[in-house]
Regions:
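Non-catalytic DNA-recognition/assembly elements of restriction-modification systems
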Residues: 48-51, 106, 147-155, 256-324
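Charged, often flexible domain-edge or linker segments that flank or initiate folded functional domains
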Residues: 2-43, 49, 322
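Phosphate/oxyanion-binding loops and surfaces in catalytic or ligand/nucleic-acid-binding neighborhoods
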Residues: 4, 11, 23, 114-117, ...
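Short intrinsically disordered, low-complexity coil segments enriched in acidic
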Residues: 1-8, 129, 136-137, 265
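Polybasic, glycine- and aromatic-enriched phosphate-binding surface used to engage nucleic acids
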Residues: 29-261
Length: 324
């Protein structure tokens, strides 16, 4: 500290000049940026012409009792119940319930990082979620679903949902889980965004982006680009070296909407990336994995090159962005 105050050891010290305006900085993070990074971030912001809105982003399902934990198993007096599905079900548990066609309509395909990758989402789910909205706080609503009712009744003592005994704690607007959308893991070592066009229900570990104002494949490319990663690192929220891609940072992203031709070009590259990621995910031999990883890396470079151009970054700025 004394060396710092005396101006010694400058080679190990980074100094920042800051102008803090109280009314602007109130209730926000104060970020320390070196001059080069600040110039690039301002350049990115100036070239942005779009952004996401509140109504286009939703957090995933909140279900405190997804599976039975040890404490709940002890409360229920049966340690063997630990790991058993409550609102979430494994494939075996789903099949064992012998659900009627009406009951199956209430159980939705549930996805985790096991199926959701950068760009590519595998539609073959391994888990299910009993998707009961707040209306199931009324116990009579469950009468039409006897097998599901019997299942949840076994855990009624430990269900703490605001909509107990049968409703999820926070089910969310179902439109976000249906059809074309982008799914984003909230806490991650590397930000990644998954394009899905199938019904895809996720937990609160994810945010879901659904909008008709963007070509969603194009938007997936922008969100997975080095430009947005750079922005999130220095203008978003970080927990140590991990990115915390919450709703607020997503709302502040400096997005861009170019011509339809430019959007179409990136969309084609995204289609190729999704195919390559799918093939990589199912590859068995080391040689196939190596070849497909090289293909993914090439496509990544092509996508980033296009995005750098859209934001008007210079060659020197690109070098800084790629160093992170």
């Amino acid at each position: 500290m004394l060396d710092f105050l005396a101006g010694n050891g400058e080679e190990n010290i980074t100094r920042f000049e800051a102008e803090i305006v109280k009314n602007v900085c109130k209730d926000t993070y104060i970020l320390f940026l070196n001059k080069k990074n600040s110039v690039i971030l301002n350049h990115i912001k100036r070239n942005s012409n779009a952004g996401l809105t509140e109504g286009e982003i939703a957090q995933g399902i909140v279900a405190p009792q997804d599976f039975c934990n040890r404490a709940s198993a002890l409360t229920l007096g049966n340690e063997n119940l630990q790991g058993t599905g409550i609102f979430n079900l494994s494939m075996d548990e789903y099949n064992a319930l012998n659900l009627s066609s009406e009951e199956k309509e209430l159980v939705k395909p549930f996805y985790t990082s096991t199926e959701l990758y950068r760009y590519y989402g595998n539609a073959n789910n391994k888990l299910w979620v009993i998707y009961t909205t707040s209306k199931f706080k009324n116990k009579s609503e469950m009468k039409a679903y006897p097998n599901l009712k019997a299942h949840l009744d076994k855990f009624i003592q430990v269900i703490t949902s605001d909509n107990k005994p049968y409703g999820l704690h926070r089910a969310r607007d179902e439109k976000f889980f249906r059809g074309e959308k982008i799914v984003s893991l909230r806490k991650t070592a590397e930000p990644y965004f998954t394009y899905t066009d199938f019904d895809c229900y996720v937990s609160q570990s994810y945010n879901v982006i659904k909008t008709e104002r963007f070509n969603l494949k194009f938007l997936t490319a922008i969100l997975n680009s080095n430009v947005i990663k750079f922005w999130l690192r220095y203008k978003g929220k970080m927990q140590g070296d991990n990115f915390q891609v919450d709703k607020e940072p997503l709302l502040e992203l400096p997005l861009i909407v170019p011509t339809e031709l430019e959007q179409a070009h990136l969309s084609v590259l995204v289609d190729q990336m999704i195919t390559a990621q799918e093939q990589l995910n199912s590859a068995i031999s080391d040689s196939d994995k190596k070849f497909l990883q090289q293909r993914v890396d090439i496509l990544d470079k092509q996508i980033n090159t296009v995005v750098y151009g859209l934001y008007g970054l210079t060659a020197d700025e690109v070098k800084i962005v790629e160093r992170g």
